[in-house]
From Swiss-Prot:
Keyword Cytoplasm: yes
Keyword Cytoplasm: yes
Name the UniProt record assigns to this protein: Ribosome-recycling factor
InterPro entries: Ribosome_recyc_fac, Ribosome_recyc_fac_dom, RRF_sf
PANTHER family reported in the protein's UniProt record: MITOCHONDRIAL RIBOSOME RECYCLING FACTOR PSEUDO 1 (PTHR20982:SF3), RIBOSOME RECYCLING FACTOR (PTHR20982)
Location(s) in or outside the cell: Cytoplasm
Originating organism: Caulobacter sp. (strain K31)
SUPFAM superfamilies: Ribosome recycling factor, RRF
Stated role: Responsible for the release of ribosomes from messenger RNA at the termination of protein biosynthesis. May increase the efficiency of translation by recycling ribosomes from one round of translation to another.
One biological process term in Gene Ontology: cytoplasmic translational termination
Annotated Gene3D superfamilies: 3.30.1360.40, Ribosome-recycling factor (1.10.132.20)
Gene name of this polypeptide: frr
Length: 188
């Protein structure tokens, strides 16, 4: 039975790791006082008759701490890219310079910083719920295996303890990521 328990638990650990990774991707899209190419990752552009991610029609660079440059490959989608960035809830105003957009990053107000911290907290809580749901799935599967006599009651308890350790580790990673992001947002 020892060989059968590892794949089961690693499958759930992988799912929890993906939840933590998803949180970090969500955090990359939250604006802080500094410029970051990840800030524009979630922006969708209406180009060529469909919605595509910004990075499929342009390259994004950060030449200065408070500026993002977007080099658009096709002049025909410059206005669509500008409109998508302007209409995003990031509060950015791009300046068109030929095929390039220069996006100055204004400093955040104290009120906006607090709003962003709340949003980050909501993202983190959503991922904690996802991790707990994965734990529930794992425990349900373990109980089914015990009921079907695939594992013994002792193995069930041992594996449930292991699932809880994995869950605690994932929750700790979420909390650490949130703390780091909050500090980054509140940094003036």
């Amino acid at each position: 039975m020892a060989t059968a328990e590892k794949p089961v638990l690693t499958r759930y650990k992988d799912r929890m790791d993906k939840a933590v990774l998803s949180l970090k991707e969500d955090f990359a899209g939250l604006r802080t006082g500094r410029a970051s190419s990840g800030l524009l990752d979630q922006i969708m552009v209406n180009a060529y008759g469909s919605m595509v991610q910004l990075n499929t029609v342009a390259s994004i660079s950060v030449p200065e701490p408070r500026q993002i440059n977007v080099n658009i490959w096709d002049k025909g989608v410059v206005s669509a890219v500008e409109k998508a960035i302007r209409n995003s809830d990031l509060g950015l105003n791009p300046v068109v310079e030929g095929n390039n957009l220069r996006i100055p990053i204004p400093p955040l107000t104290e009120e906006r910083r607090k709003d962003l911290v709340k949003i980050a907290g909501k993202y983190a809580e959503a991922q904690k719920v996802a991790v707990r749901n994965i734990r529930r799935d794992a425990n349900d599967d373990l109980k089914k295996a015990e009921k079907a006599s695939v594992i013994s009651e002792d193995e069930l308890k041992k594996m449930e303890t292991e699932v809880q350790k994995i869950t605690d580790g994932a929750i700790k990673q979420v909390d650490e990521a949130l703390k780091t992001k909050e500090q980054e947002i509140m940094q003036v």
